[in-house]
Amino acid sequence: MQELVTLECTEARKEGKPVSRYLTTRNKKTVTERIEKKKYNPHLKRHTLHKEIK
């Protein structure tokens, strides 16, 4: 079963910039741990680590 999850930038708050968020899906049965992906943050103008939030 696919579940909608939100990925949030981990570096933006440290630098005082707005956070960037992405929506993606994951399969709850096969992927039990939280997702971490490198995605582009337009506020920082570079790729940063984005982690799944609840």
Curated annotation (Swiss-Prot):
One of its GO terms (cellular component) is cytoplasm. The keyword Ribonucleoprotein applies. InterPro entries: Ribosomal_bL33, Ribosomal_bL33_sf, Ribosomal_zn-bd. The keyword Ribosomal protein applies. SUPFAM superfamilies: Zn-binding ribosomal proteins. It holds the Pfam family Ribosomal_L33. GO terms for biological process: translation. Keywords: Ribonucleoprotein, Ribosomal protein. One of its GO terms (molecular function) is structural constituent of ribosome. PANTHER family: 50S RIBOSOMAL PROTEIN L33, CHLOROPLASTIC, LARGE RIBOSOMAL SUBUNIT PROTEIN BL33C. Belongs to the bacterial ribosomal protein bL33 family. HAMAP family: Ribosomal_bL33. This is Large ribosomal subunit protein bL33. It comes from Opitutus terrae (strain DSM 11246 / JCM 15787 / PB90-1).
